[in-house]
Amino acid sequence: MAKLQVTLTRSVIGRPETQRKTVEALGLKKTNSSVVLEDNVANRGQINKVSHLVTVEEVDAK
């Protein structure tokens, strides 16, 4: 299964609480922090909710 590298590129300051919680649930803490997640429906939904704050790259599943 493919994996996604998600990077927080914009700050959550001034964003609604739901977006802050979604970023936290993805495992992102500070700007420019990255996590590698499984490519599944749940993660895709969270990424879509905060797509204006993050960048997503597909990485090889090793």
Swiss-Prot record:
The keyword Transport does not apply. Keywords: Ribonucleoprotein, Ribosomal protein. One of its GO terms (cellular component) is cytosolic large ribosomal subunit. GO terms for biological process: translation. CDD domains: Ribosomal_L30. SUPFAM superfamilies: Ribosomal protein L30p/L7e. Pfam families: Ribosomal_L30. InterPro entries: Ribo_uL30_ferredoxin-like_sf (IPR036919), Ribosomal_uL30_bac-type (IPR005996), Ribosomal_uL30_ferredoxin-like (IPR016082). GO terms for molecular function: structural constituent of ribosome. Part of the 50S ribosomal subunit. Belongs to the universal ribosomal protein uL30 family. This is Large ribosomal subunit protein uL30. The lineage of its organism: Bacteria, Bacillati, Bacillota, Bacilli, Bacillales.
